[in-house]
Regions:
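Hydrophobic, small-residue-rich membrane helices and short re-entrant helix-turn-helix hairpins
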Residues: 30-34, 165-178, 229-261, 276-285, ...
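C-terminal membrane-solvent junction of multi-pass transporters and transport-like membrane proteins
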Residues: 372-451
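Transmembrane helix-loop boundary segments of multi-pass membrane transporters
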Residues: 58-70, 138-150, 168-177, 283-292, ...
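Membrane-water interface regions at transmembrane-helix termini and the short interhelical loops
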Residues: 59-63, 88, 104, 112, ...
């Protein structure tokens, strides 16, 4: 028994390189409780990205504070429930999320999901670097793209340099980081509260209001959905007998609570100075209107927090490259993810407006992750006895292809082309700008897969 305990300790310790790769975690090394997932996912969402995402609803979409909060809460809760359900594949199998899907899409079919997940991990690496760089730039007056670019390079280099640890290190850092960021956010919120316009309403009306509300819902849904392929990467160390209900609900709590609280903060910040928020972002609002004693620690913690948050991305990128059969060492994976992410971050800082690039990234997530999740969940909870990889892959692709009709391409690519026109403009105009692509993706993929399985039984 002592040897087993020693093996468990060696395999997954804070501050040490994780021993396990993409193989199933043995029963002797399983540890923790489902409630641990609440703290881990809270750590992933108690950050500036959550605040910034919600701020888009009042800064650019035209929603008010309280209806924006409803859209934030609904979009977050709906997406978090799916992530919680996906987390159950970890305790059951002991496998990383993409490796688990080999039993659904087939060995080669899983490569597509692996490649797309690598894109997600790299994209989030870029987002985290930009957020940290923009926060750091505020300490020097902000607003200078070249200063931000220089900080992106420094932060990316540091992020890659420290990306050598594993699951338990991430879990501990995310938990303590969440508490520290929450305390600083609360202090900042209280210092700015007298300047908020708590009663600010929507500036869009009629059918355009409905379109804006759906867009806000989908933006918050997309933020959470972008983590779907990561789900069991952080639950696979739990004992196999873990309660399905607990494994599902604790991630929902960990995601929804910080998103709603920080979402309210993000929705209120543009009410202090709408023009500054639209031109330079809500970090500039904080810099201009918050007391120095709380603003400086807040910005510093964003920088540090985003650097260690980058390891979530590099960790999953490492698992994915192994799942694709690419024989790279951990440092090589970190370097590759860092170089690609730095390139994306450079584009977003020097070529594009970051808020537009960020929206583009979230919407691109929609083009595959929801349909993928629908097929995985049906396979796991309903049709687990016999794999149908061709049907699973076909249903995923059908859901993704159907969603293309409902993408608001003008919102996605409008910054690249003057007065762009797209094949579905009449439909999107009829929907008043609402982007239903994510919901269509889930619905079509689920319907095709369910129907195919039922037909196969007949």
């Amino acid at each position: 028994m002592g040897d087993i305990a020693a093996q468990t300790a060696e395999a997954d310790l804070f501050g040490r390189v994780e021993a396990r790769g993409i193989e199933a975690i043995p029963a002797a090394e399983r540890h923790g409780a489902p409630r641990d997932l609440a703290f881990l996912w809270a750590g992933a969402f108690v950050n500036y990205a959550s605040l910034f995402t919600a701020s888009l609803l009042t800064t650019y979409y035209g929603l008010g504070v309280w209806d924006g909060l409803v859209a934030t809460a609904l979009g977050t809760a709906a997406a978090a429930l799916i992530l919680g359900l996906l987390s159950n594949t970890g305790p059951r199998s002991g496998l990383p999320q993409i490796v688990f899907t080999r039993g659904i899409f087939g060995f080669r079919g899983s490569y597509l999901g692996a490649g797309l997940t690598l894109f997600l991990a790299t994209g989030w690496f870029a987002v985290d670097c930009i957020i940290a760089a923009q926060a750091g730039a505020q300490l020097f007056g902000g607003g200078n793209r070249w200063l931000t670019f220089g900080l992106v390079l420094v932060i990316a280099a540091i992020s890659v340099g420290v990306a050598v640890f594993g699951h338990q290190t991430i879990k501990v850092l995310e938990a303590y980081g969440a508490v520290a960021f929450a305390v600083l956010s609360a202090a900042l919120f209280l210092s700015l509260a007298p300047q908020f316009n708590w009663a600010q309403g929507a500036v869009v009306t009629g059918s355009n209001y409905a379109g804006a509300f759906v867009l806000g819902f989908m933006t918050c849904f997309a933020l959470v959905a972008s983590w779907y392929p990561f789900a069991s990467d952080y639950s696979r160390y739990l004992p196999a007998a873990s309660s399905t209900r607990s494994v599902t609900l604790w991630p929902v709590v960990g995601i929804a609570v910080p998103m709603i609280l920080l979402g309210l903060f993000g929705l209120l910040l543009p009410t202090i100075d709408a023009k500054l928020a639209a031109d330079q972002g809500v970090l500039a609002v904080i810099s201009a209107h918050a007391p120095t004693w709380v603003a400086i620690p807040f910005f510093l913690f964003i920088v540090v927090g985003e650097i260690w948050a980058n390891y979530l991305d590099v960790y999953t990128a490492g698992l994915v490259t192994l799942a694709m059969g690419i024989k790279l060492q951990r440092w090589q994976t970190a370097l590759g993810c860092g170089l690609l992410g730095t390139g994306l971050a450079t584009y977003a800082v020097l070529v594009s407006d970051f808020h537009i690039a960020y929206e583009d990234f979230l919407i691109l997530t929609y083009l595959w992750a929801p349909a993928w999740a629908a097929v995985v969940l049906l396979s796991f909870f309903v049709f687990e006895h016999k794999a149908r990889p061709a049907l699973a892959l076909g249903a995923w692709l059908a859901g993704t292809a159907s969603s293309l009709l409902f993408v608001n391409y003008a919102n996605l690519f409008g910054n690249l082309v003057a007065k762009p026109t797209f094949f579905n403009d009449p439909l999107i105009a009829g929907l008043h700008g609402a982007d239903f692509s994510g919901l269509v993706s889930v619905g079509v993929a689920a319907a095709v897969y369910w129907s195919g399985r039922q037909w196969g039984r007949a």
